[in-house]
């Protein structure tokens, strides 16, 4: 049987989608009207999603809350949290749900056929038959609810989405983004934040929430996607029988209306919060925003991505450089959102002055006019095109299956034209057209039409305001206090009872008979053998090469690693700056602009970084490397190595103006990252009180690095030559053959072809550089808190089990899954209202527990301290134990691209990890019994007794718990 034999479906189109090596089908389910797009190929990492067009009508976050709550039990699978049960007990390679401005998408992926079918079934039942209509408690838990524990207690609001968005709106970037869309689309859905504004989320009623669900969650409004190597006919027959045939077509009014263009540019101002003692100077965000065409235009879709690179994102790009030269903003960047009906292109200057708004706009327009008049740098255009095409061809999306990214890409057009899901995947022809257009005035005309003459635009200014967060908290507290005062004794009693009832609902586990309704694999379905490493030693001109014999589709992945273990702690901040600056300063043959363009024309990227590796065999030996990575088509290897050699051996650090620009940019980006990734920052900072690995992470990427960058910025203004000299000294010290190790990922033939080129580049390096002993370090304080202007916290507690005499075993991987998806999930997220909570046990002994966008502080630390009690009483039945094991294997066996396989092998080589060791750990996981987990209680107790904590977050919450900390200071 073929798709053509399925009477239930109408084939609207079928053709080969060659650019992604797939057979494409566009179908319509006749009875229900469901839309289906299929990409059939030989990729065993299969992907499914169902999406719905869900245009919000207000700022209550109803699409977002529904996305959270549909996965809280359904008709077939009535367990309270099937999402978590699947995370515990499936071999998924992706499992999540996402709310976009105009759609909500529920994707899953797996390499196991039966697992894939199970995931599809649970997700489809979740969206079509959720328990949200039966249990208002689900809405209260995930959305929002009043919380009152006693008649004399303070009335509060809690809820997972509510707290998530409080965290989001603490970020000026989020405030800017929401204001841009509000300014450009006042008359359609894009002016409303589908995620929800915390000010308006509590205005959402249960009834309005259900109305939204019933209106949009119907097959007639659905977009169903299948990708990969599967029996497509069997899946379609099942889909019809189990779900789609149960529904008749229904007219769903979910179309997104186009926003009419404006007669003139709009000017909008907004505010974001900073702490009371923060300076307001140079903290303003300025933006220049234009609506550019529509998302169904294949050429524009790619062309503005290229213009983003050529005009603003690349080093020395004309708009960026003009603004930086005028002293407007520390960080200037572009933004291009093509995932909505009418794409948006923006120029943004971060950390500017509000008084510079007019000058900002004038400089952009004058620069664009000059670019149109004299022509865009053709090398920059070619670099932008090549970079986009290389990324598309390589299809390396990290931990995300490429089939998922292809599917989400489909929605950029499919949502607005039922016949066009694949147009942006068939883009190699578009890239070819764009290359030809470089020699015409095509790009200049785009600038004139869409960025200069276009009045459908806005200028959005977001200014800092001291204590705005506190003002809002006080206003909310007064509003809640007034509301409570207006209630009768009976109404207050009812609120207390509702709070108790919700907690009881949250604490009550799903009945065993409900849990058994969820489909599950068995231990026998797990792969018995670990993925092997590929590390083959070679030597070229006295330099050790570790090569990884892996098929890499004609791309060479090469890393040059240089020993940096003898760098003093006081040098690490400069090394961090050096790492960020290399490749962004001029060299002997190239200006920094030309260097960036050449890199993107001839390679898939040259990146620099540092890599920290504990030596598993010798705890006192710490492997610390400076790393240069490049990816390149074999035919361009010589050019790529020449560019890398220029970067490493001839970089010019005497241009202190350029160094100042880079310091300001790094500082601005760190400010955003320290808050947005506060959980990781807090965990590393906490572990830096005892761990060399974490200390280096903090010194090179975390809070200590931010402090170093601030000092370097000051030093550049007072003694610029000293900074130049230090950077040049780092290059002289690092880049020598006796410090060098090369990692090569590619097959044997590729390596044989590359050897002469590698020998040539090695010969260009000095033979020797004095290498000292491993540097002494001074660890940070064990109990710290860092205040920012957010309304939530990131709460970390850490320790080290190796130094307490315990050993790493595979059971610790299993414990991580158990804690993440059971104890911590229930106590920190479900009951506590935090958006997330995670834990990790490293082979080297470092361990952490950390929450994400958490409304609590001391309560969360108490939850951590009770973990050993939970472990001691851990007594699952065989089915539950198997579920945890399967969930652990899901992370162990995530599919890897060639570069990731090479990187995994290299890490094992540097850390002294053997195949026998990981196979032993795998066996320990596969054969684990409850008593193996219970035996870990003392280990976790030893970790927690270290009592090393770090909290990043709200000033009032930190001050209330000031007794917990030895050091409290501002984050930035």
Q: What function would you assign to each model-found segment?
A:
Residues 40-42, 49-51, 162, 166-174, ...:
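His/Glu-based metal-binding/catalytic segments typifying zinc-dependent metallopeptidases
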């Amino acid at each position: 049987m073929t798709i053509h034999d399925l009477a239930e479906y109408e084939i609207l189109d079928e053709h080969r989608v060659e650019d992604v090596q797939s057979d494409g089908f566009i179908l319509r389910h006749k009875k229900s009207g469901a839309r289906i797009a299929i990409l059939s190929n030989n990729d065993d990492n299969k992907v499914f999603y169902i999406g719905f067009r869900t245009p919000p009508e207000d700022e209550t976050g109803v699409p977002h809350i529904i996305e959270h709550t549909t996965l809280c039990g359904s008709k077939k699978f009535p367990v309270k949290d099937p999402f978590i049960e699947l995370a515990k007990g499936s071999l998924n390679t992706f499992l999540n749900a996402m709310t976009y401005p105009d759609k909500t998408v529920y994707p899953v992926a797996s390499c196991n056929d039966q697992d894939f079918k199970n995931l599809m079934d649970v997700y489809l039942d979740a969206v079509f038959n959720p328990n949200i209509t039966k249990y208002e408690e689900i809405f209260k838990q995930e959305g929002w609810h009043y919380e009152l524990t006693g008649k004399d207690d303070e009335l509060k609001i809690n809820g997972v989405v509510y707290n998530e968005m409080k965290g989001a709106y603490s970020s000026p970037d989020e405030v800017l983004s929401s204001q841009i869309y509000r300014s450009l689309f006042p008359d359609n859905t894009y002016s409303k934040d589908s995620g929800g504004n915390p000010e308006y989320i509590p205005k959402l009623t249960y009834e309005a929430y259900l109305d939204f669900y019933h209106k949009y969650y119907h097959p007639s409004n659905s977009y169903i996607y299948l990708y990969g190597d599967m029996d497509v006919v069997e899946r379609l027959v099942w889909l019809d029988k189990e779900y789609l045939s149960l529904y008749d077509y229904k007219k769903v009014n979910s179309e997104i209306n186009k926003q009419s263009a404006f007669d003139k540019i709009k000017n909008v101002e907004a505010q974001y919060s900073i702490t009371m003692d923060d300076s307001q100077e140079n903290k303003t965000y300025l933006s220049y925003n234009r609506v550019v065409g529509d998302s169904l235009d294949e050429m524009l879709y790619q062309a503005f991505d290229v213009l983003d690179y050529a005009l603003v994102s690349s080093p020395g790009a004309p708009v960026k450089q003009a603004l930086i030269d005028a002293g407007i903003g520390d960080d200037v960047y572009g933004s291009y959102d093509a995932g909505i009906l009418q794409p948006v292109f923006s120029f943004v200057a971060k950390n500017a002055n509000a008084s510079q708004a007019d000058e900002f706009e004038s400089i952009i327009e004058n620069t664009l006019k000059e670019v149109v008049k004299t022509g865009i740098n053709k090398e920059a255009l070619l670099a932008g095109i090549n970079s986009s095409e290389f990324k598309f061809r390589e299809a390396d999306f990290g931990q995300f299956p490429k089939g998922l990214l292809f599917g989400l890409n489909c929605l950029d057009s499919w949502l607005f034209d039922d016949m066009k899901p694949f147009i942006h995947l068939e883009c190699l022809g578009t890239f070819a057209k764009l290359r030809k257009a470089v020699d015409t005035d095509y790009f200049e005309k785009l600038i004139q039409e869409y960025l200069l003459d276009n009045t459908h635009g806005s200028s959005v200014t977001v200014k800092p305001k001291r204590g705005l967060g506190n003002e809002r908290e006080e206003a909310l507290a007064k509003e809640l206090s007034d509301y409570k005062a207006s209630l009768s004794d009976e109404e207050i009693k009812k609120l207390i009872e509702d709070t108790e009832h919700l907690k009881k609902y949250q604490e009550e586990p799903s009945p065993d008979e409900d849990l058994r309704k969820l489909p599950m694999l068995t231990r026998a379905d797990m792969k018995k053998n670990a993925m092997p490493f590929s590390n083959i030693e070679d030597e070229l001109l006295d330099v050790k090469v570790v090569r990884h014999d892996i098929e890499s589709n004609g791309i060479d992945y090469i890393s040059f690693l240089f020993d940096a273990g003898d760098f003093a702690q006081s040098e690490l901040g400069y090394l961090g700056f050096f790492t960020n600056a290399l490749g962004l300063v001029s060299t002997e043959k190239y200006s920094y602009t030309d260097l960036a363009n050449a890199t993107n024309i001839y390679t898939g990227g040259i990146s620099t970084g540092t890599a920290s590796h504990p030596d598993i065999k010798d705890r006192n030996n710490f492997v610390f490397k400076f790393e240069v990575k490049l990816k390149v088509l074999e035919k361009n290897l010589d050019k790529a190595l020449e560019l890398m050699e220029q970067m490493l051996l001839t970089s010019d650090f005497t241009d202190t103006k350029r160094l100042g620009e880079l310091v300001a940019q790094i500082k601005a980006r760190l400010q955003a990252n320290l808050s947005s990734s506060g959980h990781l920052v807090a965990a590393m900072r906490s572990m830096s009180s005892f761990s060399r690995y974490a200390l280096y992470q903090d010194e090179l990427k975390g809070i200590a690095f931010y402090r170093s960058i601030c000092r370097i910025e000051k030093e550049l203004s007072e003694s610029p030559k000293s900074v130049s000299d230090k950077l040049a000294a780092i290059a002289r010290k690092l880049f020598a053959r006796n410090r060098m190790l090369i990692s090569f990922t590619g097959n044997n033939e590729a390596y044989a072809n590359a050897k002469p080129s590698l020998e040539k580049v090695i010969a260009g390096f000095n033979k020797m550089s004095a290498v000292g002993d491993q540097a002494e370090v001074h660890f940070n304080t064990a109990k710290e808190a860092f205040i920012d202007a957010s309304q939530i916290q990131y709460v970390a507690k850490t320790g080290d089990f190796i130094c307490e005499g315990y050993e790493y075993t595979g059971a610790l991987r299993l414990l991580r899954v158990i804690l993440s998806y059971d104890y911590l999930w229930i106590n920190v997220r479900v009951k506590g209202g935090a958006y997330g909570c995670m834990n990790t046990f490293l082979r080297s002994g470092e361990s952490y527990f950390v929450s994400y966008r958490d409304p609590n502080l001391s309560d969360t630390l108490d939850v951590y301290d009770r973990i050993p009690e939970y472990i001691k009483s851990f007594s699952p039945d065989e089915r539950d134990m198997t579920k945890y094991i399967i969930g652990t294997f899901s992370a162990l066996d995530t599919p890897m691209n060639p570069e990731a396989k090479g990187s995994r092998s290299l890490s094992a080589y540097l850390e002294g990890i053997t195949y026998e060791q990981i196979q032993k750990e795998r066996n320990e996981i596969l054969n684990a019994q409850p008593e193996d987990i219970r035996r870990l209680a003392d280990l976790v107790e030893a970790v927690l007794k270290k009592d090393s904590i770090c909290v990043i977050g709200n000033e009032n919450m930190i001050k209330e718990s000031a007794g917990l900390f030895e050091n409290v200071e501002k984050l930035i």
